[in-house]
């Protein structure tokens, strides 16, 4: 590289809520990570293949749990819910107290998210439509027959990206009612807080957008970029 070239170092870090006291935890190429208590559950994929492991937030007690893909994104009350990626797409539950795994439901699902009594998921058998499964009643509800690429659920709403010629980011109530379009085009990285939903245009990682929860408007969000620049200046 010539003079002035920028070298990017990949690192998964821990910091305080105000952005201070940054500590590097690992340089593994992480696809998904989840914090449960004081343990991090990490999914990494590199040239050696996938690896799912657990370690403490102080980097100690690293324990390999699986050499295949497990997405730990959905964790509730010490249980990680995930879909199978080997012989089937069943719904599984990992008890983080013991790291034991049990089969919850022999469905055909992708990207499960637990909310109360329900597991929201993409229905693999039916062109990735959005459904929810009741854990207590063993019942399926179809929320939309549209093919979706990704989604997130929380605070009474579901935000989801519709695939196809009329691609758009949409919102509905978490029972499947009152759907509306937020933005036309292809969006991803949908994150939710109690006040806003945040998302990015597919293929464009430098810009974030946000929308007040339950609204029909959205705008650019520069807070993340400004925080990063301020941290760089220190």
Predicted regions and their residues:
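A short beta-strand motif characteristic of beta-propeller blades
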Residues: 20-26, 60-66, 99-105, 138-144, ...
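Short loop/turn segments that connect beta-strands within beta-propeller blades
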Residues: 16-20, 56-60, 94-99, 133-138, ...
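Eukaryotic tandem repeat interaction scaffolds
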Residues: 68, 76, 80-84, 89-92, ...
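Repeated scaffold domains used in trafficking and secretory/extracellular systems
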Residues: 27-37, 67-77, 106-116, 145-155, ...
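Residue position within the beta-strands of beta-propeller blades
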Residues: 1-5, 41-44, 81-83, 120-122, ...
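Blade-level signature of beta-propeller repeat domains, shared across WD40, Kelch, NHL, RCC1
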Residues: 186-234
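Acidic/polar residues in short coil/turn loops that connect beta-strands
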Residues: 18, 36, 58, 77, ...
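Structural motif
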Residues: 7-13, 48-54, 87-93, 126-132, ...
């Amino acid at each position: 590289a010539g003079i002035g070239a920028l070298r990017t170092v990949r690192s998964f870090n821990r910091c305080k809520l105000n952005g201070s006291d940054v500590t590097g935890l690992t340089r593994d190429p992480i696809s998904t990570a989840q914090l449960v208590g004081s343990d991090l559950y990490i999914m990494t994929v590199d040239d050696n293949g996938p690896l799912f492991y657990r370690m403490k937030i102080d980097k100690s007690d690293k324990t390999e749990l699986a050499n295949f893909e497990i997405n730990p994104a959905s964790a509730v009350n010490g249980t990680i819910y995930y879909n199978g990626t080997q012989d089937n797409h069943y719904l599984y539950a990992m008890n983080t107290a013991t790291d034991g795994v049990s089969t919850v439901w022999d469905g055909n699902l992708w990207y499960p998210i637990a909310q109360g009594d329900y597991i929201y998921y993409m229905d693999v058998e039916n062109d990735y439509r959005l459904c929810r499964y009741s854990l207590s009643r063993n019942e399926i509800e179809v929320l939309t027959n549209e093919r979706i690429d990704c989604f997130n659920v929380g605070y009474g709403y579901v935000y989801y990206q519709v695939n196809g010629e009329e691609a758009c980011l949409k919102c509905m109530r978490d029972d499947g009612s009152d759907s509306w379009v937020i933005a036309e085009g292809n969006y991803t990285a949908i994150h939710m807080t109690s006040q806003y939903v945040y998302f990015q245009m597919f293929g464009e990682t430098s810009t974030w957008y946000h929308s007040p929860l339950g609204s029909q408007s959205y705008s650019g969000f520069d807070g993340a970029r400004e925080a990063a620049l301020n941290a760089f200046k220190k």
